[in-house]
C-alpha cells in the first residue's frame, strides 16, 4: 500500500490542490489478531463470560473483536493513535465508522486532543444530533437516503419528504452528508441502477442540491453498474468516466450557489402549498 513517504507526498499534493483529506477510522472494534492482543492487552476488549473475545453486542460481526471503552488505557491509546496521523502526516480529520457504537464522551475527548494539534474535520457514520454538539461537523443522512430509495420503488411519497424536513432533529449548523450510494449500499442493497433505474441521475441531483454536503462513491463517476465485493479486493472498471461531466457540473452548481452551501451558510428547504 506504499510507504510513509508516499503517503506524505500524497497529502501534500492534495493540500496543494486546495483539497482536504480525511481517513476512515474504526474505533469500535479491531481485527481479532490486532497487535494489542500480541501485547497481552486482552483487557482492552469486551470479553464473554468464558473470557473470549466477542463481536459488538447485537451484531453478527464475528470477524472483529469489540473494544472496551470502560478501559481508560485503551481510550488513551486510541486518542494517541488518532493524533499520530494528524501530527505525522498532516491529515485533516476522520470519517468515524459506526460512531454511535462508541461512547459520545470519547469522541468529545478525542476532538479536544486533535484540535490542539490543528483544527480537524470529523464525519460520523451515524445519525445522532448529540454528535454535532462537541465532536463532529458532519453525519450521514441515512434517513433521507432511505426516503429516496422508497420514492424510487413506490414505497414513499413526497409527503414523507415533507415530514422528514418538518421533523428535522438537527440544527442548521449541522452538516448532513447526502448520497445515493456508498460502500454498504452498493454491496448489500444494490447499485444505483438497481435501486433507482433510469432515475438515478435525478436522485443524484437531488442529493447534491438538498440541504447538506454530497458524497460521490467510487465508481459513480463511471456509471459503474455492479455490486462490489465487501470483503475482497474488487476493482472498478472505470471505462471512459462517462458521468464525470455530469458530476462536475453538479458540484460546480453546488459550489457556486450560496443557497446550496452547507449548514447555516446556505439556504433551507421550504415547502409551498397550493390548492391547484
Annotate the PLM regions.
Residues 200-202:
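Conserved interdomain hinge at the start of the Helicase C-terminal
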Residues 270-276:
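Carbohydrate-binding surface patches
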Residues 89-92, 212:
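Short loop/turn motifs at secondary-structure junctions
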Residues 1-89, 107-116:
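Substrate-binding/active-site clefts of carbohydrate-active enzymes
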Residues 204-222:
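Conserved short secondary-structure transition element at the edge of the structured enzyme core
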Residues 21-23, 94, 122-124, 140, ...:
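Hydrophobic faces of well-ordered beta-strands that scaffold small-molecule active sites
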Residues 1-4, 60-76, 92-101, 144-155, ...:
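The substrate-binding groove and active-site-proximal loops of carbohydrate-active enzymes
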Residues 15, 81-83, 87, 97-176, ...:
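Active-site-proximal helices and loops of the catalytic beta/alpha 8
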Amino acid at each position: 500500500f506504499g510507504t510513509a513517504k508516499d503517503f506524505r507526498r500524497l497529502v501534500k499534493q492534495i493540500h496543494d490542490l486546495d483539497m482536504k483529506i480525511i481517513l476512515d477510522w474504526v474505533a469500535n472494534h479491531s481485527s481479532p489478531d490486532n497487535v494489542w492482543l500480541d501485547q497481552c492487552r486482552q483487557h482492552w476488549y469486551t470479553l464473554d463470560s468464558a473470557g473470549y473475545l466477542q463481536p459488538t453486542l447485537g451484531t453478527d460481526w464475528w470477524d472483529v473483536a469489540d473494544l472496551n471503552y470502560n478501559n481508560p488505557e485503551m481510550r488513551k491509546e486510541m486518542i494517541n493513535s488518532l493524533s499520530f496521523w494528524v501530527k505525522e502526516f498532516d491529515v485533516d480529520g476522520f470519517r468515524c465508522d459506526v460512531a454511535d457504537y462508541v461512547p459520545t464522551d470519547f469522541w468529545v475527548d478525542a476532538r479536544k486532543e486533535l484540535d490542539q494539534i490543528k483544527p480537524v474535520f470529523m464525519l460520523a457514520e451515524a445519525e445522532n444530533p448529540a454528535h454535532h454538539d462537541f465532536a463532529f461537523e458532519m453525519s450521514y443522512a441515512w434517513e433521507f437516503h432511505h426516503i429516496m430509495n422508497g420514492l424510487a420503488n413506490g414505497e414513499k411519497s413526497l409527503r414523507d419528504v415533507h415530514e422528514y424536513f418538518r421533523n428535522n432533529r438537527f440544527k442548521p449548523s449541522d452538516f448532513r452528508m447526502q448520497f445515493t450510494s456508498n460502500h454498504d449500499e452498493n454491496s448489500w442493497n444494490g447499485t444505483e441502477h438497481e435501486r433507482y433505474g433510469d432515475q438515478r441521475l435525478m436522485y443524484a441531483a437531488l442529493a447534491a442540491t438538498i440541504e447538506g454536503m454530497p458524497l460521490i462513491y467510487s465508481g459513480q463517476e463511471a456509471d459503474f453498474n455492479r455490486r462490489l465485493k465487501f470483503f475482497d479486493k474488487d476493482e472498478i472498471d472505470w471505462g471512459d468516466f462517462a458521468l464525470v461531466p455530469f458530476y462536475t457540473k453538479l458540484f460546480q452548481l453546488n459550489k457556486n450557489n450560496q443557497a446550496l452551501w452547507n449548514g447555516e451558510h446556505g439556504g433551507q428547504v421550504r415547502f409551498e402549498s397550493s390548492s391547484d
